[in-house]
Amino acid sequence: MADTSKDIEELIGIMARLPGLGPRSARRAVLTLIKKRGALMRPLAETMARVAESARECVNCGNIGTGDLCEICMDVRRATGEICVVEDVADLWAMERGQAFKGRYHVLGGTLSALDDVGPEDLRIPKLRARMADEGITEVILALNATVDGQTTAHYIADELAPTGVTLSSLAQGVPIGGELDYLDDGTISAALRARKSL
């Protein structure tokens, strides 16, 4: 029984390292898994083992898939002239949930950061330049987060790609759908005002 308790505590500790899960949430999740081991824990463990073996980074865009190329890069229905640049895979998946973009993606793998000593060579920026030439890209949409590092990265990429003559754009920033002005920070309101459009 002591070994089992140790294993359970180890599982809780591992779960607590996941983003969004603290010790209390991890403990609840583990208890649920144990109570529903046939319906949840075993299928989860089997699926995690398969994903651990098969998941890999797409050699083209940086998305996560199970082959050398992800499903998006293999989809011939995707617009080939547009590429949406995102910081990480979670951002790509968020864009896909919106179902508005029908082109291809490029995952940078982070942002430029002087504090964290991350330079252009540490990101997938050289691969982006190579894809521009190889794939005949005509428009690059910079969908980077509105953080200092995200905006610094966007400006760097824009400066790098400007000589190519490609159309460069970024996502609009401002008031979210359903948002109330009273609850927004000053920077968001300023960005929304600058990005206003005619009706």
From Swiss-Prot:
One of its GO terms (biological process) is DNA repair. InterPro entries: DNA_Rcmb_RecR, Rcmb_RecR, Rcmb_RecR_Znf, TOPRIM_dom, TOPRIM_RecR. A zinc finger (C4-type) spans 58-73. One of its GO terms (molecular function) is DNA binding. CDD domains: TOPRIM_recR. Coiled coil: none annotated. Keywords: DNA damage, DNA recombination, DNA repair, Metal-binding, Zinc, Zinc-finger. SMART domains: TOPRIM. Residues 81-176 form the Toprim domain. It comes from the Bacteria. NCBIfam families: recR. May play a role in DNA repair. It seems to be involved in an RecBC-independent recombinational process of DNA repair. It may act with RecF and RecO. PANTHER family: RECOMBINATION PROTEIN RECR. Belongs to the RecR family. This is Recombination protein RecR. It comes from Jannaschia sp. (strain CCS1). The lineage of its organism: Bacteria, Pseudomonadati, Pseudomonadota, Alphaproteobacteria, Rhodobacterales. The gene is recR.
